[in-house]
């Protein structure tokens, strides 16, 4: 499944970081895009909320959104990671944000880091679905979009206002946060 959307306009930023940059956003699912199915009493996927989030956040960046899968990251396989890697490789943009489930985000970051040089890739997600009013997703997406504009090429994880290199991050399941493995 692949859907493209273009969002953004000239924000009058002029010269400087990100002034002429287009950011590619790849949607892969995860808690970020889950919704509560009242009939089944479960969380499921209906559609991505990324475009709505960008509008709500009054984002003025030029972005191209592509939904490449809607998957719980616990169900993600090496084949899915290869699909994400191929999408990153084939896109023209050098600044990429990937929305991803938090359970295996670090594994995907590791897989991408093995294959990429010259592009800045930032993975982000949410602990609570955006469809729930208390989600951290909007903040995390905004943070990732900011980080991707200023970081050196490489692979990163951005969660809850912090940004980590792919090889120095873990999900602390007890605290429900991402943290550096070595400070």
Predicted regions and their residues:
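Intrinsically disordered, low-complexity terminal tails and inter-domain linkers enriched
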Residues: 4-19
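Active-site histidine-anchored catalytic micro-motif
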Residues: 18-183
């Amino acid at each position: 499944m692949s859907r493209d959307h273009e969002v953004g306009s000239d924000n009058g930023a002029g010269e400087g970081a990100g002034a002429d940059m287009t950011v590619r956003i790849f949607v892969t699912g995860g808690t970020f895009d889950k919704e509560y199915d009242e009939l089944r009493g479960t969380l499921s996927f209906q559609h991505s909320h990324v475009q709505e989030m960008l509008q709500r956040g009054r984002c003025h960046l030029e972005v191209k959104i592509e939904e490449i899968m809607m998957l719980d990251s616990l169900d993600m396989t090496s084949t899915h990671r290869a699909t994400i890697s191929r999408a990153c490789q084939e896109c023209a943009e050098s600044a990429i944000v990937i929305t991803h489930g938090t359970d295996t985000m670090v594994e995907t970051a590791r897989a991408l880091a093995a294959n990429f040089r010259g592009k800045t890739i930032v993975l982000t997600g949410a602990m609570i679905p955006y469809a729930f009013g208390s989600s951290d997703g909007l903040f995390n997406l905004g943070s990732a979009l900011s980080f991707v504009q200023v970081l050196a090429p490489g692979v990163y994880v951005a969660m809850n206002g912090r940004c980590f290199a792919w090889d120095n991050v873990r999900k602390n399941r007890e605290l429900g946060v991402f943290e550096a493995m070595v400070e």
